[in-house]
């Protein structure tokens, strides 16, 4: 049986799932999951965080032969803040609240903006779902968990390009012509997605994650974020954010905010179930 988020206390047809992507992704990567949700009778809307999706700016040499400046050109997203990202989530939450119950779902680095949005307006969220996502309740910055010993087995150490501080972004090269780099990207984030399909997924990624997303502290309180029921969907074979660090975030959040401890479920597979098993993911979300 597919693990599920508890929606037994409500009519699914009055629930809206708000989906927040992670680093380098966009709303379009949720499309297969949204189709599966619709088939199950659930409404959903996917958010594009600032600097992501089809409007994402790219370095000037990104599509040119030799990729001039890719390692050094400062990102156009360098001035994007965590507040900007949370505002994008809040705007969507406010627009859908009138339709009924709202479940806010965050993947990976999207956990920071989603958490801050929930902290600012807990009345707009009925349940939080973290899909192998950053939970700032125990440690305020995503970098604090990425640098933890529990994350030492993570893959993808060779993916980041240049100096993030100088670039103002964590930059990768989804369109790299280097097959070794491309395979590292696939093995890190999409290892259970067939290689021929992965080329389509990587072509939709954008190169820059605003540095503010992993570097900005997100301060949560028990009276606001901590009062919202929450679920963590672990990805069992996650190579980008190993289960050890997922478990660390869960444990530290529950110690810091014990009033609404996590309901924990486990999905099989990689960091990106929206690519490899969208129907299973949808079933886990709706219950």
What do these predicted regions represent?
Residues 11-13, 17-58:
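Short, surface-exposed "cap/lid" segments of acyl-processing enzymes
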Residues 49-103, 119, 145-147:
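Active-site loop/oxyanion-hole signature of alpha/beta-hydrolase fold enzymes
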Residues 100-144:
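Conserved hydrolase catalytic core segment
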Residues 129-172, 213-214:
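Flexible "cap/lid" loop of the alpha/beta hydrolase fold
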Residues 200-224, 228:
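Active-site nucleophile elbow and catalytic-triad environment of alpha/beta-hydrolase enzymes
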Residues 232-234:
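Short beta-strand/loop motif that positions the catalytic acidic residue
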Residues 236-267, 280:
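Conserved loop-alpha-helix segment in the C-terminal half of the alpha/beta-hydrolase fold
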Residues 273-287:
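Post-His helix in hydrolase/transferase enzymes
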